[in-house]
């Protein structure tokens, strides 16, 4: 059975060595194959967890392709797998408290992209808004709800 570290390693190879633009994943769906297939024999996973694995792989892919995160920055558990209960970006943030808080009014794009809840589009909005002056409130750049609360854990308005 593949571990996430192997999948991430191969994905990085596809991007770096073969210049792939995109990698796609598909969760194995039990009951569609012969009983000798390893996926059919794995009884411990529920359909929800199987699809969450796929979702986490897409999150890692996006972090690598769009955020410029390196494969070494993807945090895996002791057995070489992704944590299914938390977002990979948030796990990185929890393991690197020295990086936070990020100063919204001073940080570069790369640092802004390390803040859980901020993506490339929001980072661009922040950088463009700063041209006209200091951002006073995160709500002023369109953040609200759960995303706003998440950003507030890792960023300050200095």
Positions of PLM-derived features:
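Conserved strand-turn element in the central/C-terminal portion of the radical SAM core barrel
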Residues: 1-7, 26-30, 40-51
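Loop-centered beta-sheet repeat module
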Residues: 1-19
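Short, basic-rich loop-to-helix N-cap that marks the start of a DNA-contacting helix
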Residues: 133-138
């Amino acid at each position: 059975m593949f571990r996430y570290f192997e999948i991430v390693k191969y994905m990085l190879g596809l991007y770096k060595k073969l210049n792939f633009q995109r990698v796609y994943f598909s969760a194995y769906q039990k009951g569609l194959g012969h009983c000798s297939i390893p996926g059919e024999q794995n009884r411990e996973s529920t359909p929800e967890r199987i699809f969450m694995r796929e979702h986490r792989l897409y999150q890692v892919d996006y972090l690598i392709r769009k955020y410029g995160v390196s494969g070494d920055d993807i945090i895996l558990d002791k057995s070489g797998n992704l944590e299914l209960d938390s977002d990979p970006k948030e796990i990185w943030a929890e393991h690197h408290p020295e990086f936070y808080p990020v100063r919204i009014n001073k940080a570069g794009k790369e640092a802004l992209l390390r803040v859980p809840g901020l993506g490339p589009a929001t980072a661009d909005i922040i950088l463009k808004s700063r041209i006209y002056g200091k951002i006073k409130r995160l709500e002023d750049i369109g953040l609200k709800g759960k995303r706003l609360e998440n950003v507030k854990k890792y960023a300050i308005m200095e």
